[in-house]
């Protein structure tokens, strides 16, 4: 689960992390009061969306002006102007795709006298099963580009969970950032605070980009991005309250209610599969035959008829779907249950696009019989290759 920058900074404040003062703005009429509260003389108006690249992004609407999603204001009037221009407009960044995201919230923050910018993040390293830190002197930039162009400028290390964070980890960060004296001590303290927050809140990623050194010699988090482990959210009702469903795909929200693993994609063929590995293979073979999947959807091993029906309804709710491929290998998941769910869903929502069903495994004959006797216009497939070719041909009208 992702949260907004201003929410991430509020979480970090709980652990004593130094962050800039700011005020969230939900409506334009709040702009002047927020600016006066911070005092100025310089303010930063930041778009709050769940995507990176906001500063270099562009708004779709001409009325939003030609500046990006992060703007520097030097007067209260300019703050009000930017808020009016940005709030409610659609921001397109490298991470939003061409559709962009509507900016429903802004964050007004005090300006900062920046001497240096750094990069610092913590994440779950799946190779070592540990929390790893990524550090670089190249702050304020796309870290993927830094890793590609100048990998020697990135330092990484992991923390042994048996010992937890140790003083030498903080010293390693200070050394990587070329900090000495009091600034090095600040870095050591910050690393300890970030690790503590990461563990306490069950985060999966914590990114500070940039971490700045002010001209007054203070280390401060100028931006913050936090992702939480969705499997651990139940332990943190306070974190759940931070969820902004307007930033999430409506279909993904609906899928989460039924414990379905659903990810919206930008293709035309809807997929319903059991098992993540088989689902990935299904997406690949659709691409192989010249089309693109509209979603990743794993119904899991113990899906009920109700769950299958919900999955089918979610797929058909996508207006981009021109065809549907159901690919089930029944083990724990029984083919007759899938078949009954598909039939029930089709009868409930109607079938306006081609549907190919491939069933194999437990109760496969019963499943095929249910579909065959349903009277529905369903194309049966013998194997995955056959299924992919049939749905691609059907979508292309061949």
Curated annotation (Swiss-Prot):
It is an enzyme of class 6 (ligase). The keyword Nucleotide-binding applies. Substrate binds at residues 274, 331-333. It catalyses: succinate + ATP + CoA = succinyl-CoA + ADP + phosphate; GTP + succinate + CoA = succinyl-CoA + GDP + phosphate. Keywords: ATP-binding, Ligase, Magnesium, Metal-binding, Nucleotide-binding, Tricarboxylic acid cycle. Residues 9-254 form the ATP-grasp domain. InterPro entries: ATP-grasp, ATP-grasp_succ-CoA_synth-type, ATP_grasp_subdomain_1, Succ-CoA_synthase_bsu_CS, SUCC_ACL_C, Succ_CoA_ligase-like_bsu, Succinyl-CoA_synth-like. GO terms for molecular function: ATP binding; magnesium ion binding; succinate-CoA ligase (ADP-forming) activity; succinate-CoA ligase (GDP-forming) activity. Pathway: Carbohydrate metabolism; tricarboxylic acid cycle; succinate from succinyl-CoA (ligase route): step 1/1. Pfam families: ATP-grasp_2, Ligase_CoA. The keyword ATP-binding applies. Disulfide bonds: none annotated. Binds 1 Mg(2+) ion per subunit. GO terms for biological process: succinyl-CoA metabolic process; tricarboxylic acid cycle. It comes from the Bacteria. Its cofactor is Mg(2+). Mg(2+) binds at residues 209, 223. ATP binds at residues 46, 53-55, 109, 112, 117. Belongs to the succinate/malate CoA ligase beta subunit family. Heterotetramer of two alpha and two beta subunits. This is Succinate--CoA ligase [ADP-forming] subunit beta. It comes from Afipia carboxidovorans (strain ATCC 49405 / DSM 1227 / KCTC 32145 / OM5) (Oligotropha carboxidovorans).
């Amino acid at each position: 689960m992702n949260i907004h920058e201003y929410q991430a900074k509020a979480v970090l404040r709980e652990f004593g992390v130094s962050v800039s003062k700011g005020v969230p703005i939900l409506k334009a009429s709040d702009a002047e009061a927020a600016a006066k509260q911070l005092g100025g003389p310089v303010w930063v108006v930041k778009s709050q969306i769940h995507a990176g690249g906001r500063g270099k992004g562009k708004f779709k609407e001409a009325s939003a002006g030609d500046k990006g999603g992060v703007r520097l204001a030097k007067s209260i009037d300019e703050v009000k102007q930017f808020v009016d221009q940005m709030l409610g407009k659609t921001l397109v960044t490298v991470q939003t795709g061409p559709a962009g995201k509507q900016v429903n919230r802004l964050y007004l923050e005090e300006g900062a006298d920046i001497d240096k910018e750094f990069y610092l993040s913590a994440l779950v390293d799946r190779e070592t099963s540990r929390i790893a830190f990524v550090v670089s002197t190249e702050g304020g930039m796309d870290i993927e580009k830094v890793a590609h162009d100048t990998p020697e400028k990135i330092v990484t290390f992991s923390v042994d969970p048996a010992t937890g964070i140790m003083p030498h980890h903080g010293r390693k960060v200070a050394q990587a950032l070329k900090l000495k004296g009091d600034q090095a001590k600040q870095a050591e303290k910050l690393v300890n605070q970030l690790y503590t927050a990461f563990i306490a809140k069950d985060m999966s990623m914590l990114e500070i980009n940039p971490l700045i050194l002010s001209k007054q010699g203070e280390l401060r988090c100028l931006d913050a991005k936090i992702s939480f482990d969705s499997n651990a959210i139940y332990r943190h009702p306070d974190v759940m309250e931070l969820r902004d469903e307007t930033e999430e795909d409506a279909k993904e929200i609906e899928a989460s209610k039924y414990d379905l693993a659903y990810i919206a994609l930008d293709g035309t063929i809807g997929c319903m599969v059991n098992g993540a590995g088989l689902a990935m293979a299904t997406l690949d073979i659709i691409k192989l035959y010249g089309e693109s999947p509209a979603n990743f959807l794993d119904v899991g091993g113990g899906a009920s008829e109700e769950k299958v029906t919900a999955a089918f309804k979610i797929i058909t709710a996508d207006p981009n779907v021109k065809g549907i491929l159901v690919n089930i290998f029944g083990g724990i998941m029984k083919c007759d249950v899938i078949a009954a769910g598909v039939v029930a869903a089709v009868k409930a929502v109607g079938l306006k696009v081609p549907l190919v069903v491939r069933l194999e495994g437990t109760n496969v004959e019963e499943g095929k019989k249910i579909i065959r006797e349903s009277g529905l216009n369903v194309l049966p497939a013998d194997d995955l290759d056959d299924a992919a070719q049939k749905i691609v041909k059907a979508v292309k009208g061949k």
